[in-house]
Amino acid sequence: MQTYQGIIVDAIYRRKFKGEIAVEHGKIISIEEKEHDIEQYILPGLVDAHVHIESSMTVPSVFARMAVARGTVAVVSDPHEIANVMGEEGIDYMLEDARKAPLKVFFGVPSCVPATPFESAGAVLDAEAVDRLLAREDLHYLSEMMNFPGVVMEFPEVIAKLESAKKYGKNIDGHAPGLNGTDLQKYVGAGISTDHESFAYEEAVEKIKLGMNILIREGSSARNFDTLYKLIDEYPESVMLCTDDSHPDTLIYEGHIDKLLRRGQEKGLDIYNLIRAAVINPVEHYGLNVGLLREGDPADFIIVDDLKAFNVLKTFIDGSCVYNDGKVLFSVEQAPAKNVFNRNKISVDDVKLAMPASGNNGEQMKKIRVIVAQDGELVTGQELALPKVENGNLISDPARDILKMVVLSRYADDPVQIGFIKNIGLKKGAIASSIAHDSHNIIAVGATDEDIVGAVNRLVENRGGIVVGTADNLIDLPLEVSGLMSTLDGKEVAVRYEQLNEEARKLGTSLMSPFMTLSFMSLLVIPELKLGDKGLFDVTKFEFVELFAGE
């Protein structure tokens, strides 16, 4: 038996007291009030209620080392990204690698692979496959149902997946940005219980009043905490905290769920409500085998120096100390590489786009649809603009910050799709990535055609990863596992990734996380205008549109 003394934070009964907990065989066997001089705080370990581990660009066992250092003892994870590339084989890869580390990872079954029928993916998880996966005990819920039009319009394939989850008694996660009114009522009525895509306070309140749980997301790109934080005190039983997509530099230097407890207190939120959102609500909602600092619970807890500073000193999982005083106390063997990548290099001719003959004379020139990126958001706007034309071809216009963007399939040598985007900010060079939600094709944006092609071809040579630079001066981060994750240690990935971000900033971008923002510009389920490997897509209309706008 081992004992630990400190100021015990009981979020269930909303009290703090000096005491001692006793741990034996991985369980808390007693919690007693006891006088002592120790000023450190003991509280339940933190839970990320929705995360795609792949977005850390590290495999689960390496992600675990970063997470426990921030007081996280469990995550609810959707292996959606790797499933889009490798299907069930990718899900099994994540499960197997996660078992190498003590972090409690509760994987779900991806519900939308591919996310839409309007893009090329490496796999399809149809209703039959989803039913088979939901029957497994090592997969715990149906992951975010992004196809909200399919739910509302009762597409048979979509409804079959929802019914499978109900049959096995497993929760259904939602994904419904901007959905409201009768459509939202129908979506919730289909059995969907959570949403992490609320961008407005009023939107989140409407969902809560219909019975949904709102997951407040604060990742590397999508950051909704400042908009939604008041919900934690106003609806304490209906809110959880999550990161969704967090890059390694964010995890190591900013923090994980711990940073939201610090920021929440700075905003005047009740500490017990914050702990409820960070631990109790996800454990109870998903039925996780994670301790809540009660007698008989698994001994999953953390020790921090001070509640407001919230510096994690120790992390315990099942009674074992996995992090102590700046050191992670478990190591993992390097994961094997695994990938699907069938693309060959491209040429400058592949990214050329000729101006239609009817639009070559002055004011009669047709305007093009331009994607308008928004820093820190997954949603985009759209606007019409006159293109810059040189030698009869449409080119990037860095002076107006209207840049050419391309998306091309990683699974076959299909034609390159071309669009234009605003607010990336590059004055020269290009950035490219094989992380391109959700099918993870190749996406690139740049100041010249030559720079775009150079970045894409370096990425093809590496069979996935991220690239930045000019055509004759490129730096990269290869991602050997499905073009999404590195097999390196988290710190190594974070350092290299920050080098790439810094290089992108030198080339002109002011985006907080340029690669993360770029990776969502082909996500055809989040409004308003996106570019996929089959063309320009209006998410609001849920249909392809021409680059050149009609009169």
Curated annotation (Swiss-Prot):
GO terms for biological process: adenine catabolic process. Its EC number is 3.5.4.2. It comes from the Archaea. This is Adenine deaminase. GO terms for molecular function: adenine deaminase activity. Gene3D superfamilies: Metal-dependent hydrolases (3.20.20.140), Urease, subunit C, domain 1 (2.30.40.10). Pfam families: Adenine_deam_C (PF13382), Amidohydro_1 (PF01979). It catalyses: adenine + H2O + H(+) = hypoxanthine + NH4(+). Belongs to the metallo-dependent hydrolases superfamily. Adenine deaminase family. It comes from Methanosarcina barkeri (strain Fusaro / DSM 804).
